[in-house]
Structure formats: structure tokens, C-alpha cells
Amino acid sequence: MLRLDRVEISQGTFRLTADWQVSAGEKVAMIGPSGAGQSTLLMALAGFVPYAGKVLWQGGDLGPMPPGERPLSILFQDQNLFPHLTVAQNLGLGISPRLRLGAEDHARIETTLQRVGLGGMGARKPGQLSGGQIGRAALARALLRARPILLLDEPFAALGPALKAEMLDLVAETAAETGATVLMVTHDPADARRFAGLTVLVEAGIAHAPQPTADLFANPPPALQAYLGQ
């Protein structure tokens, strides 16, 4: 279980609170106006932004853990692939920052690339990949870390509708296989409906408790109605 226990983020005049929990294996969307704090909340969970309160995973407090030791991986919108390295090397950084990789490591990398539909492409550089393939490579890097929590900060926002839907389905499929808990920031209600069983509305300084996605959009509160232009 992922528990946000009276979490409060304060940055100058910005303030965001969250006090809720989700079961392991859930797929959760976070939606709200730009600047409401969805991405900031992800950064706090990852350990990059200070916060008050506690973030608990399976009962253990993540607060004392540095970002690299937290049980999570994060995908950003820009994917953060190094252009001068091959795809395999980009993945390998998640195993060894100095790329000291053995035969077993290389086999794991290739297996993970095959899993996301990039088998045999490890020798290519990011500049030789399409937008969708870059997204798949970034997802493969996150999967290779084998962390139980996956945070998505709109990593597929720049893709067209069909390709974005394909990537969301791929994430959902791999999450189901691994049992990962996924939190996804999105500004697109269609993405939330397609991907997430639960949705968190972030507005007016509060990340509200997750609600069933279908119910939330069927009966949106005033703040969500305003965001949706209803």
C-alpha cells in the first residue's frame, strides 16, 4: 500500500496537501489545472522536493531514503535519454552508472527491450528512433529498475493520440504483469479514462483522495467541471 500521511508541500506561496492511500497494483491518474501541483507531488514522492508528513510504502517510511534508493521509477515528459549513448547503454545506466555490465546484465537489457517491442535495437542511438520508440526505450529503462512504484509525469504528452494510446496500453500491460503501482499525471481526461481505475483531482491546494475514474467524470465536482469547461 502507498500511503500519503498528512503530506504537505510548501514552496513560497505554493502549498499542497495530500492525505490518502492506494492499494498496491492500482493505476491512478492525477488531473487538475496547470500549476495545481500534480508534478510537484510526484517529485516529492520521488524525494526531489521536501515535504512535511510521511510517505509510506508497505508501512515503511520513505522519508529517510535518498531518491535513488526509493522503491520507485519515474518517467518524465522529455524522457531523459542521453543522445550520445546507445539505447542499451541508456538502459545500462540504471544497472551500473559506470556501465560496468556483465553478460547477465546485457541479457536483461535485451529481454527488457523485447518486452517493449524494441528487440534488436539496443545498438541504436536515441536520434535514430521515432518518438514512440523513444517512449518505449524510456519505459524499458524504468522497467529494468524493477521498482514496485512507477511515476509518470506526462511522458507521452508530445505523442499523437493513437501512439499515446498505444503507449498507455503498454504501460498498463506491463504494470499488470509486474504488479506495479502507477501514478500518472495527465491533463487529458481521455487518458485518465483509458488508463486509470482511480483518479486524484488536484486543485486549490489539495490533492483529493482517489475516486473511481468513471464515477468522478460522470459526476464531476465544481472544480473539475470548471477544468473541463462544463
Where are these regions (language model features)?
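ABC-type ATPase nucleotide-binding domains, specifically the catalytic core motifs of the NBD
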Residues: 50, 65-66, 85, 89-106, ...
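ABC ATPase NBD coupling module
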Residues: 61-78, 97, 102, 216-220
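Conserved ABC ATPase "signature" region
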Residues: 103-121, 172-173
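Conserved ABC ATPase signature
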Residues: 125-129, 133
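A short, proline-enriched helix->beta-strand linker immediately N-terminal to the Walker B motif
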Residues: 144-148
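Catalytic Walker B motif of ABC-type/P-loop ATPase nucleotide-binding domains
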Residues: 150-154
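Conserved beta-strand-loop-alpha-helix hinge in the C-terminal portion
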Residues: 206-229
